[in-house]
């Protein structure tokens, strides 16, 4: 599972997701990319599930880059606990995603394989996505 090795502070405020992503919205390494079209939180498990779906489909055919990292800790209180007595313990980590953010990049495969692989991965993610190609959208 992806998570930070160490953090300056253990717990973080909830925050807001406004606007669109300007950084991380272009393809860096790959020929194809999976781009978010809405905002949301991607958990480390969801990122990993989508990665497995892509790599299983393309097998050894292509190279995959993960462009998001879950660095925001999400806390949770135990069940049947009274309110108060501070913030809960860290349960898992999420990556904050805004519209336009490229989540995954893929190279070394043809159009059809990239389309199918990203379609399988999109089903594992809680945000709406679209497929982008270097130079144009598919």
Curated annotation (Swiss-Prot):
Keyword Nucleotide-binding on entry: no
tRNA-binding is among the record's keywords: yes
InterPro entries (UniProt xref): Ribosomal_uL16 (IPR047873), Ribosomal_uL16_bact-type (IPR000114), Ribosomal_uL16_CS (IPR020798), Ribosomal_uL16_dom (IPR016180), Ribosomal_uL16_sf (IPR036920)
GO cellular component, as recorded: cytosolic large ribosomal subunit
GO molecular function, one term: rRNA binding
PROSITE patterns: RIBOSOMAL_L16_1 (PS00586)
GO biological process: translation
A Pfam family annotated for this UniProt entry: Ribosomal_L16
Keywords, alphabetical: Ribonucleoprotein, Ribosomal protein, RNA-binding, rRNA-binding, tRNA-binding
Subunit structure, as described in the record: Part of the 50S ribosomal subunit.
Cited NCBIfam families: rplP_bact
Family to which this protein belongs: Belongs to the universal ribosomal protein uL16 family.
Function: Binds 23S rRNA and is also seen to make contacts with the A and possibly P site tRNAs.
Protein name as it appears in the record: Large ribosomal subunit protein uL16
Source organism phylogeny: Bacteria, Pseudomonadati, Myxococcota, Myxococcia, Myxococcales
């Amino acid at each position: 599972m992806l998570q930070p090795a160490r953090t300056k502070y253990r717990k973080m405020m909830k925050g807001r997701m406004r606007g669109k992503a300007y950084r991380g919205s272009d393809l860096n390494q790959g020929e194809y990319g999976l781009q978010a079209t809405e905002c949301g939180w991607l958990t480390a498990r969801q990122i990993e599930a989508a990665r497995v779906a892509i790599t299983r489909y393309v097998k050894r055919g292509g190279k995959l880059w993960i462009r998001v990292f879950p660095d925001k800790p999400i806390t949770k209180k135990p069940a049947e606990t009274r309110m108060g007595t501070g913030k809960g313990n860290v349960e898992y980590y999420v990556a904050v995603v805004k519209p336009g953010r490229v989540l995954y990049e893929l190279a070394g495969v043809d159009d059809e394989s990239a389309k199918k692989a990203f379609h399988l991965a999109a089903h594992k993610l809680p945000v709406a996505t679209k497929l982008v190609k270097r130079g144009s959208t598919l």
